[in-house]
């Protein structure tokens, strides 16, 4: 890829994510992008909240546990959105600031439900230290996902959904806070 073409796609990816942060390109699936976000910002034993209201929320719980994270699941029935108040309660109860991240799916592919990512991210921001890691594979490009305005730290997406491109590429946008967490992260990294 020429430097001119590279400049164009980097600029357009930032525009799509509504961010001034870095957007990285990975040759892999949306799952690879989300796993990359998890392993590059967290460390073994870190406490995380995972939203689970469908197949992909379920997947992030499994991935987080596979990497030795301490996972608290906030669950909703399939076909129902995650309750932002459940996240608020869990985050407010965390006076020791042990929760390092909230991991959730914006648009749950398996059911079509869109979770209130904006409200949940607002509660994470009020916590003060936790990161918001969002699976936006089916939402980015199809609905509004203003990364900077919502205070999202990691946004994972894939070419084959909202981008309407052939599969095989995925994208990980990382905030400055996510890059700081990367410096401390000790999980094994393949991406």
Where are these regions (language model features)?
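Single conserved hydrophobic/aromatic residue that forms the stacking wall/gate
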Residues: 1-5, 9
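Conserved beta-loop-alpha segment that forms the PLP phosphate-binding cup at the N-terminus of a helix
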Residues: 21-49, 53, 57-62
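General beta-strand structural signal in soluble alpha/beta enzymes
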Residues: 24-27, 50, 73-74, 103-104, ...
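Short beta-strand elements in bilobed, periplasmic/extracellular small-molecule ligand-binding domains
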Residues: 69-77
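Active-site phosphate-binding strand-loop segment of PLP-dependent enzymes
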Residues: 82-139, 162
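Conserved active-site segment immediately N-terminal to the catalytic lysine
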Residues: 148-160
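Active-site C-terminal subdomain of aminotransferase-like
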Residues: 160-191
């Amino acid at each position: 890829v020429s430097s001119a073409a590279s400049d164009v796609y980097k600029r357009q990816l930032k525009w799509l994510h509504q961010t001034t942060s870095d957007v990285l390109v990975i040759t892999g699936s949306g799952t690879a992008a989300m796993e990359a976000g998890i392993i590059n910002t967290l460390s073994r034993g870190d406490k995380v909240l995972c939203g689970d209201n469908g197949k992909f929320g379920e997947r992030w719980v499994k991935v987080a546990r596979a990497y030795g994270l301490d996972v608290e699941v906030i669950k909703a029935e399939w076909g129902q959105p995650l309750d932002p108040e459940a996240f608020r309660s869990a985050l407010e109860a965390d006076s020791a600031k042990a929760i390092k991240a909230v991991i959730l799916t914006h648009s749950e592919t398996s059911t079509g439900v869109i979770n209130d990512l904006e409200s949940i991210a607002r509660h994470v921001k009020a916590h003060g230290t936790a990161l918001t890691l969002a699976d936006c594979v089916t939402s980015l490009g199809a609905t509004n996902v203003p990364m900077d305005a919502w205070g999202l730290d990691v946004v994972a997406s894939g070419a084959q959904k909202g981008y309407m491109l052939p599969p095989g590429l995925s994208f990980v946008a990382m905030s400055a806070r996510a890059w700081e967490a990367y410096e401390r992260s000790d999980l094994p990294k393949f991406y």
